[in-house]
Amino acid sequence: MAAPDEPHRPGAGVRSAVVVVPCDPLQPTLDFFTRRLGFRVDAIFPADAPMIAELSGHGLGLRLQPGGELDGEQPGAHLRLRLRCDDPTTVAGGDRELVAPNGTRVELVEADPGVVLPPEQPELVVTHARDGETWGTGRAGMQYRDVIPGRQGGRFIGSHIRIPTAGPVPDYVHYHQVRFQMIYCHKGWVRVVYEDQGEPLLMEAGDCVLQPPEIRHRVLESGDGLEVVELGCPADHETRAEHEISLPTGRLLPERHFGGQRFVYHDASEAEWRPWRVPGFECREIGIGAATDGLAGVRVARPAGADHTPRTTHDAEFVFGFVLAGTCTLECEGRVPERMEEGDTFVVPRHLEYALIGCSPDFELLDVTLPEDVPLT
C-alpha cells in the first residue's frame, strides 16, 4: 500500500487488460481464435455449459462473453483487431483479413513494414509566416506549423515547431521510422539526449542535428521562445515509444550507424564558411551529406558579394529553403515574384527556373536538398 503522502500513479494496481469480445454462441468464435489464430485458453466457465472464455496470445488478452445482436448485426461486428505478423501471408492461408463467427474483423499486417516511400510528386510550394498560418498542437504539447502543405504527395514533411515558454518538455524516449530527418534550431535553446551520444546536448540558435533512422532520443527542456525547423522523409512515418532503453545510455559512440547513417551535431559557433553552389554566396556546411553517404545535404547560405542568384533549374529530388534572417524576392517561372522574409519557406521542383533576387546583406537561408549534390541545369 502506498504511503499516505505518496502521489497516486495512474493505473497503479492494474495487473492486466483484456478486450471484451461479444459473441453468442461461444464455441464457434472460441474455435476461430484458438485453432486459426493460435490464441490459448486461460480460463473458461462455467464448466458444465461454457459461456465465457478468456484467451491470450500475441501480446493481447481477449474475453469472449455473451453479447446480443445490435440492429440485426452480429455482436462483434463493430470490433476490429490487428495482428502484427512477420509474414501475414503465412498465418491464415494467405488471407489478410478474416471475419470471426461473431462478426469481429481481424486484420493481418506486417509487424515491421519498413519505410514506405511514396512516389515523387514535386510541386512548387511557398509559405509565408506573416500570413498567420495555423499553429496546431502536436506531440508532447509542442506547437507545429506545416511548411510543406501537400507534402509533395506524402514524400516529405516540414514543420516549424515552437515552444513559447521555458521549462521541462513532457517528452518520452522515442524513435522515428524514417529515411531522413533533421532538426535545425532557429531561435532559443533546447536540451536533448540521444542514444549512445554521451550526455544531453544543448542546442542553441544555429545548431543542427541529423536524427538517423530509429535513433532513440528525448527532448528534455527548452528556454523561452524556442523555434526549430524539422524536415523528414517520408511525411507519414511512425513515431514509436521506447520502453526498454533509458537515456543517456552512458556510451559515446559517434561512429555508430543507425539505418546506414551517423548522428550529426553541428555546433554553429565552430562552423567554417565556404563557397555555396551558386557564385557570390557562401555557406556553412552542416555535415549531413557525409553522414548520410550523400543522401541529403544541409547548409546555411548567405551573400558573399552578390545580392542575387542566377536564374537556373535543378534536377534534384528535393530543394527546400527556410529564410532565417533578412529578406529576398523569390522569382519562379510563370509566377508573380514573392517577397520572402524570416520564417517564409519554399520548395522548388526540378526543371522549374527560379532565382533569389534582392537579397539583403543580412539574408540567411536554411538550404536542404536531396541528394547532397544538386545537379544544376
Report residues per predicted region.
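N-terminal beta-strand motif that seeds the catalytic metal site of vicinal oxygen chelate
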Residues: A2-L30, H78-L81, V109-G136, G141, ...
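A short beta-loop-beta micro-motif enriched in histidine and acidic residues
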Residues: S16, D48-P50, Q152-F156, G167-M182, ...
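Core segments of cupin and vicinal oxygen chelate
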Residues: G11-G13, V20-L62, T134-M142, D146-T165, ...
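Vicinal oxygen chelate
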Residues: R15-P25, A53-L60, G67-T104, V178-H186, ...
